[in-house]
């Protein structure tokens, strides 16, 4: 069957009412060190164009505003893109409807292309070919994903793991299967090597520190695609395991929250 990138994007479950706002409120931002690294690899302090594929609500797009002449986010889902456009992004940041395999960006126009927590949702051969087309010679592509949950407190993280175990059990009990086609993140680097598009491919880890409250940890849990179908079962928070997660997070993180250590796995390549 022919791969339909827009249909595949919709199967994430990210089109649910209220999801985009929850995602935007609780997901972490990329670390400043990542931007510095990509600027260094691209050999420029101020790129003419940065393209963010699968830009979602714009978290990973707007961070480039102070660093680039122009930033374009490509996002297939209207609901996520509407949240991005409703924000206070500067005038040099814009968002377009599109998929990673068909961006509408001119040949060789981009200095930097990023996929933040999104490459595993896209068919890789067509996506990498499009990235190769829109990148200039010497331009840089980076796919980066964070480990979840980020580390905040051992007991809160243990409660998060228990919640996810419960989610998997509920999926099995109710016969919920993943509809969306996905590609393993651990295989990104090998696919980038095999594409023949890039002169140099490397992999590293970076981290960021943000603030995590109980509300944020629970909200983050409710933005994970594996969790979303379980939330539709009509179960109580106690039956879902959210009550136990919330109570542990409130007890361990306190009213002000604690530092949240977010590890990013970065796969970067130079064309």
Question: What is each residue range found by the language model?
Answer:
Residues 132, 136-210:
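Conserved catalytic/acceptor-binding region of the Class I
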Residues 57-102:
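Class I SAM-dependent methyltransferase SAM/SAH-binding core
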């Amino acid at each position: 069957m022919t791969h339909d990138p827009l249909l595949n994007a919709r199967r994430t479950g990210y089109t649910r009412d209220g999801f985009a706002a929850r995602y935007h409120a609780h997901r972490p931002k990329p670390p400043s060190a990542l931007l510095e690294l990509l600027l260094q690899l691209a050999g420029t302090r101020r790129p003419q164009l940065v393209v963010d594929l699968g830009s979602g609500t714009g978290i990973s797009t707007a961070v480039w505003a102070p660093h680039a002449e122009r930033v374009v986010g490509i996002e297939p889902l209207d609901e996520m893109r509407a949240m991005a456009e409703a924000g206070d992004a500067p005038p040099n940041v814009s968002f377009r409807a599109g998929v990673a395999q068909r961006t509408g960006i001119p040949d060789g126009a981009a200095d930097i292309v990023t996929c933040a927590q999104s490459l595993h949702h896209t068919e890789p051969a067509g996506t990498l070919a499009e990235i190769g087309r829109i990148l200039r010679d010497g331009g840089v592509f980076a796919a980066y994903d964070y480990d979840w949950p980020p580390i905040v407190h051992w007991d809160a993280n243990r409660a998060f793991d228990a919640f996810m175990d419960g989610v998997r059990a509920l999926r099995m009990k109710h016969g919920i299967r993943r509809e969306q086609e996905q590609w393993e993140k651990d295989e990104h680097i090998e696919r980038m090597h095999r594409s023949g598009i890039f002169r140099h491919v490397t992999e590293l880890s970076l981290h960021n520190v943000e603030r995590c409250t109980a509300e944020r940890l629970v909200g983050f849990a409710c933005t994970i695609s594996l969790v979303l179908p379980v939330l539709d079962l009509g179960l109580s928070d106690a039956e879902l395991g959210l009550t136990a997660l919330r109570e542990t997070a409130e007890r361990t993180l306190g009213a002000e929250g604690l530092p949240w250590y977010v590890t990013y796995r970065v796969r970067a390549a130079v064309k």
